[in-house]
Amino acid sequence: MRVLGIETSCDETGIAIYDDERGLLANQLYSQVKLHADYGGVVPELASRDHVRKTVPLIQAALKEAGLMASDIDAVAYTAGPGLVGALLVGATVGRSLAFAWNVPAIPVHHMEGHLLAPMLEDNPPDFPFVALLVSGGHTQLISVTGIGQYELLGESIDDAAGEAFDKTAKLLGLDYPGGPMLSKMALQGTAGRFVFPRPMTDRPGLDFSFSGLKTFAANTIRSNGEDEQTRADIARAFEDAVVDTLMIKCKRALESTGFKRLVMAGGVSANQTLRAKLAEMMQKRCGEVFYARPEFCTDNGAMIAYAGMVRFKAGVTADLGVTVRPRWPLAELPAV
């Protein structure tokens, strides 16, 4: 059984084909980073137009990579939300149209469920139950996961997501878009302890996050200490350490409250090597395990949508004839399978 996955929720066009027996057969990705770089962030209209240009050619490339024809596809999965409405509509319209033309089911997929299940693509996938840390440019959430669709929100950011805070602080440091990965690279040259940033909301009970204050703290620190190269690196180090420590503290609390021994980290920020190392160290001390996808499957991609689509397809989920997307879509609303 083979599922074609289409991801167009933001600024990456991702197409993949997943086979339930052979695994991932094809994975095509086009990033719009250069398109949006001059604007310092994603421009929704430009993103939508570029998805229109790239989606069908990438589908053709994926079929060629897998050595398949359209008649070999058993279902088409597409990201139906959350995300940018225009971008979502491109993928949903193409996916629904292909499914109709090929006479196969169309499977709407939740973008964050795709991220959550991305570690399942690895050779050592996690077993249920586990705590999931979904951490990206648009989301920072802690989820109790006891099965597919059995998701309980434990905590989330009340303002900026962690990835958003990375990008905004990187901009303050004069780094180009997308700044998060560049900030992490700069932090490697920083001196630990020269600056100490707060660990927001760790001094009170609960599992919610708040990262907007760190951006303000960074701006004030830059203003007070100048902008020479080493100072900028030291500030980047202090900022990253604060975010990583905050995420680690909240993950530890979530594991303690649930009693689970497994932690899954997913989303674009899960590619951060400092975060991976800190969480791995924490889980080793707790005699637990941490799981995450390979770096190319941490950011938006079609493989996670194809896999999540396969899981939902086997459970009997299909789309109605119309094209519907949900720019805002709580993960907890998904049905269990």
Curated annotation (Swiss-Prot):
Highest taxon of source: Bacteria
Cofactor note: Binds 1 Fe(2+) ion per subunit.
Cofactor: Fe(2+)
Swiss-Prot/TrEMBL keywords: Acyltransferase, Cytoplasm, Iron, Metal-binding, Transferase, tRNA processing
HAMAP family (UniProt xref): TsaD
GO molecular function, one term: N(6)-L-threonylcarbamoyladenine synthase activity
One Pfam family in the UniProt entry: TsaD
Cell location: Cytoplasm
Keyword set includes Zinc-finger: no
Catalytic activity reported: L-threonylcarbamoyladenylate + adenosine(37) in tRNA = N(6)-L-threonylcarbamoyladenosine(37) in tRNA + AMP + H(+)
EC number: 2.3.1.234
Family: Belongs to the KAE1 / TsaD family.
Name of the protein in its database record: tRNA N6-adenosine threonylcarbamoyltransferase
Alphabetized InterPro entries for the sequence: ATPase_NBD (IPR043129), Gcp-like_dom (IPR000905), KAE1/TsaD (IPR017861), Peptidase_M22_CS (IPR017860), TsaD (IPR022450)
SUPFAM superfamilies according to UniProt: Actin-like ATPase domain (SSF53067)
PROSITE patterns per UniProt: GLYCOPROTEASE (PS01016)
GO biological process per UniProt: tRNA threonylcarbamoyladenosine modification
Keyword Endoplasmic reticulum: no
Entry binding sites for substrate: L134, V135, S136, G137, G138, D167, G180, N272
Role of this protein: Required for the formation of a threonylcarbamoyl group on adenosine at position 37 (t(6)A37) in tRNAs that read codons beginning with adenine. Is involved in the transfer of the threonylcarbamoyl moiety of threonylcarbamoyl-AMP (TC-AMP) to the N6 group of A37, together with TsaE and TsaB. TsaD likely plays a direct catalytic role in this reaction.
Main location as per UniProt: cytoplasm
GO cellular component entries: cytoplasm
Annotated binding of Fe cation, by residue: H111, H115, D300
